[in-house]
């Protein structure tokens, strides 16, 4: 019987030691990671067709932007990307903006410079 008592004392000492330093032990089960909530984006409520105020803003402000892309116009005027592309085509045909680069996925325009426009047309002719 005395050996059993010794084991109990040793076990009691071990369990007390385990309770003391659970953090410093490298073995054992790690805490399970909780799933984080994903970032919630606000729903964009962009216009599908122009109203009078937005169209006037397009005609007045957009030709003064240094960098004009469908993404920039869409974000600033709160219109759909397809509407922004069509609007920029119209401004280009009116001669209010100048094409810088055209690619399948990205079109870049800039404002018309007053001095730089005439010599460029003269060189082409």
Swiss-Prot record:
Any matching Pfam family: Ribosomal_S25
Is Acetylation there in the keyword field? yes
This protein's source sits in the domain of life called Eukaryota
Give its localization.
Answer: Cytoplasm
One CC-aspect GO term: small ribosomal subunit
Look up the signal peptide feature and give its range.
none
Keywords (alphabetical) are: Acetylation, Cytoplasm, Ribonucleoprotein, Ribosomal protein
**GO process annotations (BP):** cytoplasmic translation; ribosomal small subunit biogenesis; rRNA processing; translation
Molecular function (GO) terms for this protein are: RNA binding; structural constituent of ribosome
User: Which stretches does UniProt call biased (Basic residues)?
Assistant: 28-38
Q: N6-acetyllysine (modified residue): where?
A: 43, 52, 60, 66, 94
Give residue numbers for the modification (N6-succinyllysine): 52, 94
For the region Disordered, what residue ranges are annotated? 1-38
Query: Where is the sequence biased in composition, kind Basic and acidic residues?
Result: 1-23
**How is the quaternary structure described?**
Component of the small ribosomal subunit.
Its function, per the record, reads:
Component of the small ribosomal subunit. The ribosome is a large ribonucleoprotein complex responsible for the synthesis of proteins in the cell.
Family statement: Belongs to the eukaryotic ribosomal protein eS25 family.
Q: What is this protein called?
A: Small ribosomal subunit protein eS25
Q: Which organism is it from?
A: Homo sapiens (Human)
Organism ancestry: Eukaryota, Metazoa, Chordata, Craniata, Vertebrata
Q: Which gene encodes it?
A: RPS25
């Amino acid at each position: 019987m005395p050996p059993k008592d010794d084991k109990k004392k040793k076990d009691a000492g071990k369990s007390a030691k385990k309770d003391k330093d659970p953090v410093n032990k490298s073995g054992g089960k790690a805490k399970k990671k909780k799933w984080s909530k994903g970032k919630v984006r606000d729903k964009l409520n962009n216009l599908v067709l122009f109203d009078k105020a937005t169209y006037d803003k397009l005609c007045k402000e957009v030709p003064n932007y240094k960098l004009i892309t469908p993404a920039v116009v869409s974000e600033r005027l709160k219109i759909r990307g397809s509407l922004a592309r069509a609007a920029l085509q119209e401004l280009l045909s009116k001669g209010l903006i100048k094409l810088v680069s055209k690619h399948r996925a990205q079109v870049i325009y800039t404002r018309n410079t007053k001095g730089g426009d005439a010599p460029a047309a003269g060189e082409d002719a």
